[in-house]
């Protein structure tokens, strides 16, 4: 399983050019571009989550069938960041940014053609693939104008805030956009935002870094196993409550197969000199502490996207009635992110 041709450190990050301060207006433009890219990506997920019931009516599908739209959107976003790191290192930041945003615009155009559940599933799968690099771009654009000592204390909290802001903001503005109840309004908004992102990426290029060949053949094998594993987990945990866990045998079978695929991938990665997934680093005390903190953070945030909306829907509240709550959540999210950037 080991790669004899690899050498330790071959997959190290290529050196970045020395930091050159940008004029204040240009620095602000990069940070605004990051904000817009982050919102474009996160609003897409937020709108999909908020309108699954509406989509079922438009596509002629049941609630359990429309849940698969969320599955195919989230699955590639869960696993693609693993490969995006090496893709970015091998092909360069600028090319990575330009190709990513072109694909995102193309998928936004394609989404206008979805007329039934089958075509919608294909479009949402492509949307998840196209949206995965946008989180990376949002981070890169937020960090680009900041000096090295400010990247983690100011840039990181602000980028995370803008990415997290999309979910509550989508539910807050959703009633304003769906005035006639048509999903096409959402698609046109996403298309317009993607085109603005395209202009921003080409007008504000990222500083090019050195490239190096880091993608190995075994990376594709490991990535395939991890993708199958994460895809199975996403499918089970997203649809489990809808189908109910003990009623359908395939849920347990899919979880078992996902665990087996993940274990096999970890065994392969442990025997590689330049792994796609550095298991030893991920299981270090510092990373385990960070993982636990992020897990708690995500559990708390899940209340915004599934807990509270599900409760209000069960109680019979319309989206217009709960919109003020999500405006408050969005404002609190923004305020918390800014406070974090000022305090750290």
Stretch-by-stretch model annotation:
Residues 27-44, 48-52, 63, 107, ...:
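12-transmembrane solute porter fold
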Residues 49-79, 119:
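Extracellular/periplasmic helix-loop-helix junction of adjacent transmembrane segments
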Residues 54, 82-86, 176, 342:
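Membrane-interface helix termini in secondary transporters
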Residues 56, 60-67, 153, 157, ...:
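Small-residue hotspots at the loop-to-helix junctions and early N-terminal turns
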Residues 70-86, 135-140, 327-339:
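Central cavity-lining transmembrane alpha-helices of secondary-active solute carriers
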Residues 85, 89-217:
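Helix-loop-helix hairpins in multi-pass membrane proteins, especially solute transporters
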Residues 163, 175, 179-292:
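Hydrophobic transmembrane-helix bundles of small-molecule transporters
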């Amino acid at each position: 399983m080991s790669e004899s041709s690899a050498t330790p450190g071959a997959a190290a990050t290529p050196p970045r050019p020395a930091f050159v301060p940008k004029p204040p207006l240009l620095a602000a433009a990069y940070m605004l571009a990051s904000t817009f890219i982050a919102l474009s990506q996160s609003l897409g997920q937020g709108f999909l989550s908020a309108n699954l019931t509406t989509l079922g009516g438009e596509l002629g599908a049941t609630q359990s069938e429309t849940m698969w739209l969320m599955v195919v959107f989230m699955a590639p976003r869960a696993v693609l960041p693993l490969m995006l790191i090496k893709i970015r290192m091998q092909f360069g930041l600028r090319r990575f940014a330009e190709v990513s945003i072109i694909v995102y615009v193309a998928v936004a155009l394609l989404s206008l053609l979805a007329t039934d559940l089958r075509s919608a599933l294909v479009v949402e799968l492509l949307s998840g693939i196209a949206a995965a690099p946008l989180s990376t771009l949002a981070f890169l654009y937020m960090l680009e104008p900041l000096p090295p000592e400010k990247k983690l204390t100011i840039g990181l909290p602000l980028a995370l805030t803008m990415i997290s802001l999309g979910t509550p903001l989508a539910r807050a503005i959703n009633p304003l956009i769906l005035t006639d109840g048509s999903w096409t309004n959402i698609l046109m908004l996403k298309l317009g935002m993607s085109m603005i992102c395209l202009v921003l990426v080409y007008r504000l290029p990222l500083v090019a870094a050195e490239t190096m060949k880091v993608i190995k053949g075994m990376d594709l094998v490991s990535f395939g196993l991890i993708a199958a594993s994460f895809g199975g987990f996403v499918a089970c945990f997203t649809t489990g409550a809808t189908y109910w866990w003990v009623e359908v045998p395939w849920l347990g079978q899919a979880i078992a197969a996902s665990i087996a695929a993940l274990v096999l991938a970890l065994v392969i990665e442990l025997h590689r000199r330049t792994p796609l997934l550095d298991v030893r680093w991920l299981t270090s005390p510092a990373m385990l502490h960070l993982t636990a903190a992020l897990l708690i953070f995500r559990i708390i945030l899940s209340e915004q996207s599934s807990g509270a909306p599900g409760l209000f829907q069960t109680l019979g509240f319309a989206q217009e009635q709960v919109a003020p709550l999500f405006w408050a959540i969005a404002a609190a999210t923004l305020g918390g992110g800014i406070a974090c950037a000022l305090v750290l």
